[in-house]
């Protein structure tokens, strides 16, 4: 699979640091000094304090065995989820997140993904504050041959969403994907606006299953965790897309999202093209992170 090689390369920064730290631990044997160095490395890779503490406990407990496999087993169990998100028909997916996390591109990638799954998709450009976002999504929609609903004369995202869902009902759309305005979690009025959009779906279009997907910049580390925590106060987050997974990304934030906020990473963005979005495979992710296997071409 090409994705394995891409993910392997995207995790290069964390993989090199983490695998080197564990290999050094094997050579030097477990000691207070080597454990402290491992702790610093894991924290720097954004795994989160609780996850790091658990890993250190495993290393101590299995210090005379192959503790790397034990660590891998723990990581896999901590990220286990029953199955990938199932899209009921009809559904509406709000793509939410902070400015600069790649919401508009991710909305297009998700549309491409679900069209490939055989879904009839409609895009809604509800980022009414940024004309460039509407124009960008319009270009993507043409490439995808997917219809897009927008209203360049309206500053009310909920109104645009309403129009989109009305169209979706008349056209028997399976999935409506909504590009929302980027907002800082500290902007109370914009967060209230997001809550209003969720109410429009639940109150006016109860036949639609509401899904909220947050875009998370893989390079922002623990700051992304704080952002997700605040967003979760306004809308129920069903999953996250880890974006900007390039060679500098640390990527360990997936553990904190799942273990502290119960938000699973469902997709990983590993490039700018429409096909550069993959289902998150946590087993492959952990093997890549720990350097347990070579990338497959």
Task: Give the role of each language-model region.
Residues 178-184:
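Short, flexible active-site loops
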Residues 96-97, 179, 215, 269:
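Short beta-strand segments
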Residues 126-128, 180, 218, 244:
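Generic detector of well-ordered alpha-helical packing
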Residues 112, 182, 220:
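Active-site proximal helix/loop that lines the substrate pocket
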Residues 1-11:
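Disorder-to-helix initiation segments
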Residues 9, 13-128, 133-169, 173-178:
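Primarily NTPase-proximal linker/entry elements flanking Walker-type ATP/GTP-binding cores
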Residues 157-171, 185-290, 294:
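Conserved catalytic-core segment of NTP-binding enzymes
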């Amino acid at each position: 699979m090409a994705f394995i090689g891409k993910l392997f390369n995207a995790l290069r920064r964390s993989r090199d640091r983490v695998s080197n730290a564990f290999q050094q631990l094997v050579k030097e044997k477990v000691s207070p000094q080597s454990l402290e160095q491992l702790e610093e490395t894991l924290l720097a890779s954004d795994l989160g304090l609780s996850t790091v503490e658990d890993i250190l406990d495993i290393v101590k407990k299995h210090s005379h065995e192959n503790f790397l496999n034990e660590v891998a087993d723990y990581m896999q169990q901590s990220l286990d989820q029953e199955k990938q998100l199932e899209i009921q028909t009809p559904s509406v997916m709000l793509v939410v997140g902070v400015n600069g996390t790649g919401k508009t591109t991710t909305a297009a990638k998700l549309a491409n993904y679900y069209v490939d799954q055989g879904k009839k998709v409609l895009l809604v450009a509800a980022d009414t504050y940024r004309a460039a976002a509407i124009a960008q999504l319009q270009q993507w929609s043409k490439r995808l041959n997917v219809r897009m609903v927008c209203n360049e004369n309206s500053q009310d995202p909920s109104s645009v969403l309403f129009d989109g869902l009305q169209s979706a009902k008349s056209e028997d759309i399976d999935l409506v994907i909504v590009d929302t305005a980027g907002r800082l979690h500290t902007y109370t009025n914009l967060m209230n606006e997001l809550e209003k959009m969720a109410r429009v779906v639940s109150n006016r279009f109860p036949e639609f299953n509401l899904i909220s997907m947050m875009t998370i910049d893989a390079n922002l580390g623990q700051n992304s965790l704080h952002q997700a925590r605040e967003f979760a106060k306004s809308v129920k987050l069903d999953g996250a897309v880890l974006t900007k997974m390039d060679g500098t990304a640390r990527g360990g934030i997936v553990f904190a999202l799942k273990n502290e906020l119960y938000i699973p990473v469902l997709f990983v963005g590993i490039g700018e093209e429409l096909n550069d979005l993959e289902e998150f495979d946590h087993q492959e992710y952990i093997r890549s992170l720990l350097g347990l296997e070579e990338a497959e071409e």
